[in-house]
């Protein structure tokens, strides 16, 4: 199965470096993250701009607070507005409106293959006002700022600042693997996404070196702390750069994992269809055998059919369904 998936990935263009690997969304996401940081201490204006984004495209603002009034918001939840289970058309519309309202210069992307998305029912990175601590959203903003600084300038001071805020946020309500998705959205070449698809892919020695797989397996059994997350992120890049894989960075890795999982899902759907078809056949296997026994072991199809109807006490409706 894995070898089939690898052929599927190569067929889609990994070895030839076609446009599928250009990831136009990265420029937009990175620029928007940088722009969002300017609202860290002016969240009231940010909330008004979010309302404008939705008004501009005649859509309702999603539920972001227990009441009707949004009193605060964090930057990862803002990214979650267009990285959750919505249609591609709505996603493009929201991003297009964001580009206008926030004056983003990067091209508005229209392809989002391989980008991890949130569950619509868990689309905020904070608990609603009665279920969160006073500094929860402030902490997320501090992590957001530290993550951008660390991604743009990897030194010991920025690494330590990132680790401090990551560990603080990791223990907050509504934070689980989604925090790694958020980090990936804002700086996809710097942070590895550890959603279920990537964890599955990274844990297979067909996709990554055995020593890497062994070193991270226990670390991804639960949401890692900062030390473990940084270990995984650094070890992954080292493994990718030192081996002959089609993927050389986190976006390519995530895209490969997405393609592989889609192939597996297609295989499961096909198998499910075959099982369903087999079950329909097996429904009549025993009655056919019994009918043949009853008529002495040899009979025309019409005689066997008549005997099955008699033995199974089939109604007119069932008989007609059988004909169809």
Language-model segments: which ranges?
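Positively charged, polyanion-binding regions of nucleic-acid-associated proteins
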Residues: 275-303, 307
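Basic polycationic patches enriched in arginine
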Residues: 6-12
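Short, positively charged loop/turn segments that connect secondary-structure elements
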Residues: 279-280, 309-324
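Short helix-capping/hinge SLiMs at alpha-helix to coil transitions
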Residues: 188-189, 292-297, 310-314
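Short hydrophobic alpha-helical segments that form membrane-spanning helices or hydrophobic packing faces
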Residues: 179-186, 303
């Amino acid at each position: 199965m894995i070898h089939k998936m690898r052929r599927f990935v190569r067929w889609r263009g990994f070895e030839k470096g076609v446009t599928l690997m250009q990831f136009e969304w990265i420029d937009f996401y990175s620029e928007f993250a940088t722009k969002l940081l300017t609202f860290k201490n002016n969240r009231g204006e940010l909330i008004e701009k979010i309302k404008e984004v939705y008004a501009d495209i005649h859509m309702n603002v999603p539920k972001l607070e227990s009441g009707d009034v949004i009193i605060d918001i964090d930057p990862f939840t803002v990214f979650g507005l267009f990285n959750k289970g919505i249609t591609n058309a709505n996603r493009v519309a929201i991003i297009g409106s964001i580009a206008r309202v926030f004056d983003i210069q990067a091209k508005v992307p229209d392809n989002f293959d391989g980008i991890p998305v949130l569950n619509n029912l868990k689309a905020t990175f904070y608990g609603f006002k009665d279920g969160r601590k006073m500094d929860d959203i402030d902490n997320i903003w501090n992590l957001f700022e530290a993550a951008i600084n660390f991604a743009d300038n990897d030194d010991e001071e920025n690494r330590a600042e990132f680790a401090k805020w990551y560990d603080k946020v990791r223990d907050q309500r509504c934070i689980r693997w989604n925090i790694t998705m958020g980090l990936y959205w804002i700086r996809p070449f710097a942070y590895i996404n550890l959603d279920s698809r990537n964890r599955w892919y990274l844990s297979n020695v067909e996709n990554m070196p055995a020593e890497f797989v062994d070193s991270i397996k226990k670390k991804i059994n639960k949401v890692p702390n900062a030390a473990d997350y940084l270990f995984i992120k650094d070890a992954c890049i080292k493994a990718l750069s030192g081996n002959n894989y089609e993927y050389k960075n986190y976006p390519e890795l995530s895209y490969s994992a997405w393609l592989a999982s889609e192939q597996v899902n297609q295989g499961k759907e096909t198998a499910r269809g075959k099982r369903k078809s087999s079950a329909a056949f097996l429904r009549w296997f025993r009655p056919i055998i019994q009918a043949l026994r009853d008529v002495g072991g040899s009979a025309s199809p019409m005689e066997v059919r008549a005997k099955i109807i008699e033995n199974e006490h089939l109604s007119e409706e069932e008989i007609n369904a059988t004909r169809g």
